[in-house]
């Protein structure tokens, strides 16, 4: 069983020089505004670290968290950073600010060698949004051989059982979800433990 032994906030940045040194492997969490990034990060880490804004799209900072994972069964202990990116698809900002902000984010994702895993959160109720398709294409265009891209579906518990099953059959594998009610789901769906194992496996495949 994987246990998160430590998770704490490092810093926020809006420019590259403000980012912490690239000393350990990192996973990036991205998704459109109001997709549930804060909820996913807090569930994953077992701690209320990520804060959501009352106004979707208002936050324009990349937030860095340091985490230590322990897998006792395999005598493994490893430290990774989690980077929480601002939600994309916001509307209430000026064009100049939007351009500046997007420039920082894409530069961060392009040049930071410590990023090993991109986790793209997608609302399970809205699978075919153009904004998510564009984000996926842009991230995959950036991918280096030592990086991986995974989709993870949020708000899975908002679907009825037929919708859950249909998504499970048709979605790319590994099938990963986030919900506040993992224990209430059918046993065929991934648990929080499986989500953690999958992410850890990808982070360890190409260590920094």
Swiss-Prot record:
Keyword Ribosomal protein on entry: no
One matching Pfam family: MMR_HSR1
Cofactor(s) the protein needs: Mg(2+)
Record GO terms (molecular function): GTP binding; metal ion binding
Top-level taxon of origin: Bacteria
Residues noted as binding GTP in the record, renumbered to the chain: 31-38, 57-61, 84-87, 154-157, 182-184
PROSITE patterns: G_ENGB
HAMAP family for the chain: GTPase_EngB
Stated role: Necessary for normal cell division and for the maintenance of normal septation.
Protein name: Probable GTP-binding protein EngB
Organism of provenance: Helicobacter pylori (strain ATCC 700392 / 26695)
């Amino acid at each position: 069983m994987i246990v998160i032994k430590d998770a704490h906030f490092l810093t926020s940045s809006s420019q590259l020089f403000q980012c912490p040194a690239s000393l350990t492997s990192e996973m990036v969490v991205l998704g459109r505004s109001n997709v549930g990034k804060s909820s996913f990060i807090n569930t994953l880490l077992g701690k209320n670290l990520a804060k959501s804004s009352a106004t979707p799209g208002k936050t324009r900072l990349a937030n860095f968290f340091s985490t230590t994972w322990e897998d006792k069964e395999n005598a493994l202990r490893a430290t990774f950073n989690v980077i929480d990116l601002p939600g994309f698809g916001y509307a209430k900002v000026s064009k100049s600010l939007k351009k500046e902000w997007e420039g920082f984010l894409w530069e961060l994702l392009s040049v930071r060698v410590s990023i090993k895993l991109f986790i793209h959160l997608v609302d399970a109720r809205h699978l075919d949004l153009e904004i998510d398709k564009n984000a996926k294409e842009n991230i995959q265009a950036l991918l280096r051989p030592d990086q991986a891209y995974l989709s993870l579906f949020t708000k899975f518990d908002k679907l009825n059982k037929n919708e859950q099953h249909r998504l499970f059959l048709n979605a790319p594998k590994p099938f990963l979800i986030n919900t506040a009610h993992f224990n209430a789901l059918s046993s065929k769906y991934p648990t929080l433990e499986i989500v953690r194992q999958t992410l850890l496996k990808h982070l360890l495949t190409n260590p920094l």
